[in-house]
Structures are given as structure tokens and as C-alpha cells.
Amino acid sequence: MLVFGTRPEAIKMCPLVNELKKRKELQTVVCVTGQHRRMLDMVLEAFDVTPDYDLSIMKDKQTLFDVTTNILNRIKEVLEKEKPDVVLVHGDTSTTFVTALACFYLQIPVGHVEAGLRTYNIYSPYPEEFNRQAVSIISKFNFAPTELSKQNLLKEGKDPDSIYVTGNTAIDALKTTVRESYTHPELEWAKGSRLIMITAHRRENLGEPMRHMFKAIRRVMDEHPDVKAIYPIHMNPVVREIADEFLGGDDRIHIIEPLDVLDFHNFLSRSYLILTDSGGIQEEAPSLGKPVLVMRDTTERPEGIAAGTLKLVGTEEETIYNEFSRLLSDKEEYEAMSKASNPYGDGHACERIADVLVRTL
């Protein structure tokens, strides 16, 4: 059984669903929590995945308390009915943590996809760092995307025989979504300009950090008339309010509704550079040859920084302004970042995970 509930999880788990369904030795059941609703459904449709169970927990202004209690109350019935041999969860969301906790209560083995990412600061990112550390205590199968993730798990005392380095399933997803023939009206609008993709939504960046981020972006945009930006905005009303205040009203910055995964990956592949506080984009962009400025104070993906394709710029206005300006003005710096190696795998992570399950279950 696979359980997931948010758009980022779905992007990385749907390719695994489809790979597992090819394996006749396995019976695959999919349960979604609906922690994100509209954005989750867009991904399910893009990968042609139909859940067997949908807990539909999302409600307006839901808190971490709401998400946790609603999933815990509803997942119990599904797990008791299906009695799975293993439950696969992904990464670090509340869906992931609560599902793993429910499995622990019912003594059902857990497989953790994208295991071993760490900042070792449980409040950054919040609550994700706590979630993934807690799941690692529970999990029987640990599918680490990189060798560094494996080393983190070994340092924490995980059994070496429980850890499998697979690569990241995000790269598998890109193989099916990025298309040379793709077109979109927004990309036509940006043609002839350097296109900047913006994403920003992290809980710990809400408020002043996000204001600093957007002020820096607006300043740089004002100084570079050959640049256009597209920001597929998150559904969170707080994010929308801040974005409208600092980025609204500029005819070279298009704030648009969330894109489905096929659109989003193709926008990334046609961008000049990316400004983000997202985790998943830090993995996707290197395989597309796109420099990324990470607007966070910490990252659980240091492999991309070591490889040179990511740069951690924090949330201070002047730092973001300086680094964004440099990438637009310094061709050598840009070329070095765009040609850096991709540390996140070869697009065969799902096959490796499926192979492990066929061998061991």
C-alpha cells in the first residue's frame, strides 16, 4: 500500500505506483489523504493514477492539529481492512508522519521513500524535519535517494541492511512529463525574454521572511527589463496576500494559479533560472540544467549545493538581491551553475524500489 496526500508527494509517488502495478508479484493499493486537494488531484490526473481510498481530509484554514487528528482517525480503518504487508510513505509531510505512526500502532512495516534527508534543526523546515526523523525511527525499509542520505541514516544507528540507495523518484517523474513539443500561452508571453520561475510557500517563511524575498525579487526585476517572471502561486491565502502586495501590478511578473505537474515541469525546463523555497525543485532543476537560488536558511539537500547547481541564499533581502543580480549579470557564474552535475539519480529509482519489494516481501 502507498499513502500520500500532497502535491509534492504525489509527483514522486505516482511514478512508483505505476511501476509497482507492472509487477505481477505485488498487489498495489493506493490511499490518498487529500491533505492538499486541488493540487493533489492535478497530479493524479497527469499520471493517470486512481486511488483506491481517498480520505478527503482537507478543510479551509486547517492546522497541523486538524491534519494530524483527521488522518489518524481515518487511516486506521483502511489499514485494518487491507492488512498490507508494507506501507510506503514519502518524505516528510504530516501525511507521512501520521501514517507511519498509525502503522506503528498496528505493527505494520513501513517503507520510507526519500529517507535520510536532514537539516538536524527540527524547526527548519517546520514541521518536516521532525516528521522525517520520526519516520526513520519506525521504518523497516529506507529508500535513500543519495549516498549522503544513507550516511545520515547509518550515523543514526539504522541497520545497514535496511537502507537502499535508489536515486530520487522526482527524476523518474521528469522522464514522463518534459516534452519538446510542449507549448503554453504563458511561455509564448515570455518568449524573447529570460524567464524566471518563482515558487515560495514554506510555513517558516510566512511573514517577514517572505516580504524580504519578494522585495528583493521586485528590485532586481525593475533593474533588468529583459527578464520576465512567472509565479504559480500556492493556495495559502497568506502567501497570496504578501505576493500581491510586493509582486502584483508589474506587467513583467505574472502571478498565475497553480500548474499541474506536466505544465510545471515544462515551465521549469524552459526557464533561465529558478528562485524557490521548495524542496522538490532542488532535485528537479539540476537534471534540467537550471541554476537554483534557494530562499531558505537551511536545506536538507546539500548534494545540490556541493555539485554547484544550487546556491543557498537565505531570506534576507540584500543577499537575495545580490545573488539574483549576479546570476543575471555574470555569464561565467551562470554557466558554471547550469552545467553542474546532477547528484539525484538517473531516472530509475522506482525500478530499484520495486525490485527490493519483489525480493523481500
In which residue ranges do the predicted regions lie?
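Nucleotide-activated sugar donor-binding and catalytic core shared by glycosyltransferases
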Residues: 1-231, 236-361
